[in-house]
Amino acid sequence: MQILLAALVAYLIGSVSFAVVVSSVMGLADPRSYGSKNPGATNVLRSGNKKAAILTLVGDAFKGWIAVWLARHFGLPDVAVAWVAIAVFLGHLYPVFFRFQGGKGVATAAGVLLAVHPVLGLATALTWLIVAFFFRYSSLAALVAAVFAPVFDVFLFGTPGHNPVAWAVLAMSVLLVWRHRGNISKLLAGQESRIGDKKKAAADGGAQDGGKA
């Protein structure tokens, strides 16, 4: 019962879509209506509002971090922490508050990894930054970081074995790659948008939806 309750709370925390909330508060178009239609920081950046994108990034990462931190703060066993990690991540992917139309989980996964172990989170984030800096593709950076996260985990803690948190990290990585399957096709076809690209639809949407709740 304790694990179920912790996972439920984590899922609800993850279901808060900061991309949608921040955009609404700042009078911007719903990020699900333009660009990649993904409610995440990279797509919010396409609106041209860097502040909104940063707030989205921080908010999505924070909810992943706080869910796992709380689980450990209250002394829950590793199996509960693992389920909390997966639940908050799934909450972001399929948020109950937003008709289950969620993001791809990059920032939330980063927050989870930082809470699991700061070095694990920082190593994965650094991997994302390096790939993003050289190639300017957020999706490619996310895919590479997702592949390397379990590898970093093995280097830090050894093979997963009976460590449920390590298996949770692996599960999140697999889910994150699966959520980027459309991006993989675009990358292979040379049609993927680069970081910082602004969509005319975003600007038009912002002008039309500005001031709406």
Swiss-Prot record:
Membrane topology: Multi-pass membrane protein
Keyword field contains Endoplasmic reticulum: no
Biochemical pathway: Lipid metabolism; phospholipid metabolism
GO cellular component, one term: plasma membrane
GO annotation (BP), single: phospholipid biosynthetic process
MF term (GO), any: acyl-phosphate glycerol-3-phosphate acyltransferase activity
NCBIfam families the UniProt entry points to: glycerol-3-phosphate 1-O-acyltransferase PlsY
Function text: Catalyzes the transfer of an acyl group from acyl-phosphate (acyl-PO(4)) to glycerol-3-phosphate (G3P) to form lysophosphatidic acid (LPA). This enzyme utilizes acyl-phosphate as fatty acyl donor, but not acyl-CoA or acyl-ACP.
Name used for this protein in its record: Glycerol-3-phosphate acyltransferase
Lineage: Bacteria, Pseudomonadati, Pseudomonadota, Betaproteobacteria, Burkholderiales
